[in-house]
Amino acid sequence: MKKPLRWLAALTVLLLPLSALAQQQGLTIDIVGGSASATPIAVIPMPYQGSDTAPQTDVSAVVGADLDRSGQFRTLPAAQIVEKPTRGTEVQFQTWRTLKQNYIVVGRVMDAGEGAYRVEYELFDVAKGERMLGLAMTARANAMRDVSHQMADAIYEKITGVRGAFWTRIAYVTASGKGGAMRYALMVADSDGYNPQTIVRSAEPLLSPNWSPDGKKLAYVSFERGNSSIYLQDIATGARELVSSFRGINGAPSFSPDGRRLALALSRSGNPEIYVMDLGSKQLTQLTNHFGIDTEPTWAPDGGSIYFTSDRGGRPQIYQVAASGGSANRVTFQGNYNATASVSFDGKKIAVAQGSGNTYRIAMMDRSLGSPSWSTLSPGSLDESPSFAPNASMVLYAAREGGRGVLYAVSSDARVRQRLVLADGDVREPAWGPYRTAH
């Protein structure tokens, strides 16, 4: 059985066979865990009040689903919404106090002309009867889900003080067919699985997608040339560039925080080592030189150092080395197997695939209070490839269930989990993208 470590797959040039699937499908979300301590919030249906064709997107449903899957909120079920105000002046706060709601969101959708819509919405503190937020947004019909995610982000941030990450994207790999007829696709979708987009198709395995910090490009590993090679690809235009095809392993690309460099694992000198490539000049700098296997680099948020997986101590653990090279320091000490690090935006948390015997789960090391504390985020037996949301509120990872691959997103406090699954296939290699910016 394949262990959750990309460098083992790279060394043996093997990939676990995946079952048939429809690659154009979006991922569907199934919340499989919740929290009784989540904050109650009523998201009232927002009716279309225009005279043209109503938008297909149910704005309030998207906003409510976003808040639910964050684990921080618990929306009021539709059957319990006894009143449907569309503006603050219509809100009867005592009704919502009786229903034990902490917050209420109301709004409406109107025509904005030329096929566009205007959404006006307000957020209220029920106990105080005070408005916390009042905004209006305009978009065309095909961007109404984007608007809905941005609304959820604003509501989330206003209440929690933490920037929301609903209007973000995820990358993942799918496959179809069996044996020699396998076909792979690198996909990008909204963080809730909608709007899937095929970035590249291949008859050979695709691995290790990694986002550029501006969200415009993906780096990934392809075996289409027979050996592993690393490509950069523009998501909007499809233009791609081959940046590494040395003899041996070319693996685990990771963009620097400024987007100018790429960390990668190469075995060009015989043993897998960590290198940094200047993407302008293509000049390589070797950071490690050890008889052990060094792989899976990921940058610290300040760009000053790189975390990586190494078995130099006998078993895979996470180490850290300066981006300019030098001696490496071991970071993880709990457990015999820690690999595939993902680092939170503030550098205080590190999510890893942690192994014990034949069981691999996602664990998180939190250094917020100084000395490291550990927590287990996933309950599976073969969980791998953790990837933090840009606000570190959730971790996306891959799992095996019923003989096929699925994705999970778990809150960083492990209170809520959600499964992202294709209707009839496998999905692996997740990577959560950066914040998006409105144009």
UniProtKB/Swiss-Prot annotation:
Gene3D superfamilies: TolB, C-terminal domain (2.120.10.30), TolB, N-terminal domain (3.40.50.10070). One of its GO terms (biological process) is cell division. Its main location: periplasm. GO terms for cellular component: periplasmic space. Residues 1-22 form the signal peptide. InterPro entries: 6-blade_b-propeller_TolB-like, PD40, Tol-Pal_TolB, TolB_N. Keywords: Cell cycle, Cell division, Periplasm, Signal. It holds the Pfam family PD40. It comes from the Bacteria. It is found in: Periplasm. Belongs to the TolB family. HAMAP family: TolB. PANTHER family: PROTEIN TOLB (PTHR36842:SF1), PROTEIN TOLB HOMOLOG (PTHR36842). Part of the Tol-Pal system, which plays a role in outer membrane invagination during cell division and is important for maintaining outer membrane integrity. The Tol-Pal system is composed of five core proteins: the inner membrane proteins TolA, TolQ and TolR, the periplasmic protein TolB and the outer membrane protein Pal. They form a network linking the inner and outer membranes and the peptidoglycan layer. This is Tol-Pal system protein TolB. It comes from Xanthomonas oryzae pv. oryzae (strain PXO99A).
